[in-house]
């Protein structure tokens, strides 16, 4: 109502988000979905990291870790984010593409089934239930660092040693990065948020000017299953970060500082990873 010509929104709820987008479009504003797709929405463009690729990285990271940590018979619990979140659906597509062939071949065994959630206490409860019912579980695909952290703490209290029980993560949180350095998490998917913000800003300038953004910016599409349409998308490349690549990624980008990362018992691990703390 105050003359905005472009609306950028990150919809936590697709039903509410779709209503907002319908209102914006009716008042002449172009809508950009930011980071998360509004299912059933009327946005013109979507800006995010390639979320299927995020899932691919999680799956491949687990596979690499299983080999590096010498887990000879991986019995894997696959965990998911909230099923109402389209990003969680895309992450799942990505890591199932990596893991399902291994399950089918018998190289890996899928054990248990946990309800999807983004709530860490609920994720821990789901893991505990599955771990109690299936004591052979020795690797977990967790979709983000926040869900992984309480599971790692639980396993540590159970006496699980470093580099014996592969666990994955996403978002490059401080705790997640520290768990990686300590040898309790395989790696994390890092999404440089400044690139996402820059892409949204660039797209906004084209829309405000009434111009069609170039293919060098809008480089893909994302399917909206509610409307059965492909949404023109800016899809950015996520990165898999391990202890060996922290210095060249999250530290270089100042996403976290060495001082934040390398306190106490992690000083030796930071020196080993060539992170000056």
Give each language-model segment a name:
Residues 1-277:
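A residue-level marker of the well-folded mature domains of exported/periplasmic proteins
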């Amino acid at each position: 109502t105050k003359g905005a010509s472009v609306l950028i929104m990150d919809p936590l709820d697709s039903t509410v988000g779709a209503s907002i987008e319908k209102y914006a479009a009716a008042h002449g504003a172009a809508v950009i979905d930011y980071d998360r797709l509004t299912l059933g929405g009327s946005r013109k463009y979507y800006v995010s990291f390639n979320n299927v690729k995020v899932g691919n990285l999680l799956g491949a990271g687990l596979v690499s870790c299983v080999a590096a940590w010498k887990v000879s018979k991986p019995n894997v619990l696959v965990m998911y984010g909230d099923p109402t979140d389209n990003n969680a659906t895309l992450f799942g597509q990505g890591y199932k593409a990596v893991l399902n062939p291994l399950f089918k071949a018998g190289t890996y065994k899928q054990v248990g089934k946990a309800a999807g959630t983004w709530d860490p206490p609920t994720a821990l409860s789901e893991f505990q239930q599955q771990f109690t019912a299936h004591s052979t579980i020795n690797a977990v695909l967790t979709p983000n660092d926040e869900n992984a952290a309480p599971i790692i703490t639980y396993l540590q209290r159970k006496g699980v040693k470093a580099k014996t029980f592969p666990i994955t993560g996403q978002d490059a949180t401080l705790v997640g990065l520290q768990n990686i350095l300590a040898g309790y998490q395989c790696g994390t998917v890092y999404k440089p948020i400044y690139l996402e913000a820059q892409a949204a800003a660039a797209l906004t300038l084209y829309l405000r000017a009434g111009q069609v953004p170039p293919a060098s910016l809008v480089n893909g599409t994302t399917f909206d299953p509610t409307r059965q349409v492909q949404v023109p998308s800016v899809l950015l490349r996520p990165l898999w970060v391990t202890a060996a690549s922290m210095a060249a990624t999250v530290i270089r980008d100042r996403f976290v500082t060495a001082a934040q990362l390398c306190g106490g018992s992690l000083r030796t691990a930071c020196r080993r990873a060539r992170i000056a703390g």
